[in-house]
Amino acid sequence: MPDASLFNGTSFITLFAPNISLLQASIDFYTNFLGFAIRKNSNQKLFWLQLEEDQNNVSIQLILDPEHAASVSQIDQNIRNLTRSLYRKDWRSIQSNIAFKSSSLSKLVKLLKDGGHPVQQSPNEISPFEVYTVDPLGSLIGFSGFKNPFAVNERSLLPKVSEEKAYRAEDDSEKLLNPVRKTIGVMTSGGDSPGMNPFVRAVVRAGIYKGCKVFCIHEGYEGLVRGGEKYIKETQWHDVRGWLVEGGTNIGTARCKEFRERSGRLKACKNMIDMGIDALIVCGGDGSLTGADRFRSEWPSLIEELLQTEQISQQQFNTHQNLNICGAVGSIDNDMSSTDATIGAFSSLDRICRAIDYIDATANSHSRAFIVEVMGRHCGWLGLLAGLATSADYILIPEKPASSREWQDQMCDIVGKHRARGKRKTIVIVAEGAISNDLSPISCDQVKDVLVNRLGLDTRVTTLGHVQRGGTAVAFDRIYATLQGVEAVNAVLECDADTPSPMIAIKEDQITRVPLVDAVELTQQVAKSIESRNFKKAISLRDSEFVEHMKNFISTNSADHVPPSLPLEKRKKIAIINVGAPAGGMNSAVYSMATYCMSRGHVPYAIHNGFSGLARHESVRSINWLDIEGWGSLGGSEIGTNRTLPNDADIGMIAYFFEKYGFDGLILVGGFEAFISLHQLERARINYPSLRIPLVLIPATISNNVPGTEYSLGSDTCLNSFMEYCDVIKQSAAATRNRVFVVEVQGGNSGYIATHAQLACGAQISYVPEEGISLAQLEMDINSLKESFANDQGKTKSGRLILKSENASKVLTTEVISTIIDDEASGRFDSKTAIPGHVQQGGIPSPMDRVRASRFAIRAVSFIERHSDRCQTFKNSISFRQTDEITSTAVVLGIHKSQLRFTPIRQLYDFESDVPRRMRKNIFWSNVREISDMLSGRTSL
């Protein structure tokens, strides 16, 4: 029970409860935690509460009144929203609060936290002036230590301590203010990978934001064993500035034999205790994570031994009884089970695809064959996806071995047929772990000898080596490494001694936690299965997407060169059209659709220059294999695209040409214009029988605003292109010192690109159409810039970025915002604008866009195959009606939590679309905005 003098100020408030249980919970909250006493009880429906021995007559009236009270569901939702935004938003900006004055905030914080109530402290947890919590009715209760409610320079409420004591890890005042405050250590181990620096940056800033101390352990386990301030360094917020753009790991990594022995782990334990570290976050491969989990399991015996040998005190022993461990996978091979992607894998894939794109030019010039060796000792993910993204002629990976004679015959057969059809170049990708089915390794020189001796090709070998590891991370790795770093901090703060060590994973495009031991065991089973020649089990342990990519590569690689897999009566005529603005991956979709159709026996058609090209010029061409060779690596749209809709182009003429060519299915590739086009075609079916065919939309737009999907082709290419642009701009701002750039972002009414670019580029502020720009927010942001630049005196990397979506505000344009900032800066810093414009569409598509375009296109063709016969039954029906069965044949193919699904256009158009704003109704990236603001130190109103 707190003292009666704990707080005062507000004289009288009335609160309504919807039921008896919440009424009683509220009474318990105010009496047990805040020191109120029941002064009056009227029929168990009205209670008067008053502070005990209070001179200011502070009273609360609690009334059971379902009519005036918020509903139970509303109260629960409000409490969930506040709890979820505890570390992300200032509660004062979310709802109004009931305010009290208190002379003992530290005591109040301890009482509330001991009772399990969420507590938000402002401006920080070290020296709070205001404290906020939530009562059982969802009311926001505030407590201020200010005598003057408008004061900003009140003395610190921390107990006075000596300077020496203030720097001790076991400082009593810190314990009083935050009894569960942790000290987190973060390290990188094993092979380096792009994205490790963004991960460490996220851990440091998220940890500091949540009131923790964070130590970076340099040189991996080697630094942990050696210890001392040289290897284990406390890291501040500004220390990790600029790390997003840097490749590798700035805190170093090294393999450590000593840590494999118990004596080495004992030293590591002692060093961690000396620094006060009670939680460890490790980013590395399966070996590094296995070592971390073993370290945790031995921790009780290690500290017991340290106590027995008097290397630590009894107090240290009591304080560090448990060690929380959390792992994240940093590996370019993408060889960890239980996660869809490891940190650095897509960056490495990007390096490989760029290198092969460059090699293509010289190979084509000299009509040569190139053997390209890529990394992947036990995992062929890099080789497989690189082969799919670059349309390689043949790949050799560990998961699909064959006898020496078999792979040689198969490779020569495919390459020979490609050459006979007129292809001038040959690319064969060999994973470093490629083997034949007798487990003998397959070297690049062996492959070269086969091509030279059997086909007489001028052949060269290129080993990419460590080029695959180097360089800055791509947007995907920056974003997801950052999200994993934040989640790792949450994990070590939430786990207890009984919780199995978690590993942060990406499953279904969501950041999740999986048991670390289970993930490592599954990963090691793959290598064991390959060693025991159980190749079916090895590939079954890979995720389903890996198997699908394998099948897709085999199908597209054999296009038009082997007998079709479908009988004659099952073969169709399938058309593809691009609609809307160009987007990375459009050509890849056309290439994959056409080659897959050829392998199945279908006839692929391309409609050139959109619906206007079809209606005005009958721009329909059947697709020839050699004509589209190399399209997978090209940006833009080779068949042409525009924004003309079917109704505007003459839908009657479009239907006529569909009838003339006898199309059995149509694939649309494009953005919101393609979405509207699909809707118009589906509605016109009642008048035009030729449109009663399966219709599939593959979303492709940099805005990622198409309803029915969380990913559109071109958005990843756009993010990478815009990120590279911002990296250069930020470098200029940092070199100039005291400069902020306001960069305009495309995306229409969608803030997807601006939000994710803020996370990938480290921009301090982003403005998006979903939120708009209020004058209050702009004023707060400018004040934040002033403080940032004032604190930057003498520091490097002092440039700042502000991202502004083009439609965030029609009044506060990019130029206007820059001018306002310049004026408010009063010469302390300056502001410039940068408008990249259509540069954001990107040039060569990213590997992710290429691979997903292939997957989308093949799924779309398969959908047409499944539904074509059904459509034939009602195609010429006089009594045609739009039943659910019929409407389900006009669909949007999209990704929802990494699962591909087909959603009827009618459902999406009627219920999930904001057509006037050209947007989807559900905004799925709002949590990313909160994390972006948290890591940039921005307060969002």
Swiss-Prot record:
InterPro entries: 6-Pfructokinase_euk, ATP_PFK, Glyas_Bleomycin-R_OHBP_Dase, Phosphofructokinase_CS, Phosphofructokinase_dom, PKF_sf. Allosterically activated by ADP, AMP, or fructose 2,6-bisphosphate, and allosterically inhibited by ATP or citrate. GO terms for cellular component: 6-phosphofructokinase complex; mitochondrion. Its cofactor is Mg(2+). Beta-D-fructose 6-phosphate 2 binds at S331, I332, D333, M375, G376, R377, E432, H466, V467, Q468, R469. Its EC number is 2.7.1.11. Keywords: Allosteric enzyme, ATP-binding, Cytoplasm, Glycolysis, Kinase, Magnesium, Metal-binding, Nucleotide-binding, Transferase. Its main location: cytoplasm. Beta-D-fructose 2,6-bisphosphate 2 binds at residues 643, 701-705, 746-748, 806, 838-841, 918. One of its GO terms (molecular function) is 6-phosphofructokinase activity. Residues 559-572 are annotated as: Interdomain linker. Gene3D superfamilies: 2,3-Dihydroxybiphenyl 1,2-Dioxygenase, domain 1 (3.10.180.10), 3.40.50.450, Phosphofructokinase domain (3.40.50.460). ATP 1 binds at G191, R255, C256, G285, D286, G287, S288. Beta-D-fructose 2,6-bisphosphate 1 binds at R739, K832. It catalyses: beta-D-fructose 6-phosphate + ATP = beta-D-fructose 1,6-bisphosphate + ADP + H(+). Beta-D-fructose 6-phosphate 1 binds at R368, R460. The keyword Nucleotidyltransferase does not apply. Belongs to the phosphofructokinase type A (PFKA) family. ATP-dependent PFK group I subfamily. Eukaryotic two domain clade 'E' sub-subfamily. Catalyzes the phosphorylation of D-fructose 6-phosphate to fructose 1,6-bisphosphate by ATP, the first committing step of glycolysis. Heterododecamer of 4 alpha, 4 beta and 4 gamma chains. This is ATP-dependent 6-phosphofructokinase subunit beta. It comes from Komagataella pastoris. The gene is PFK2.
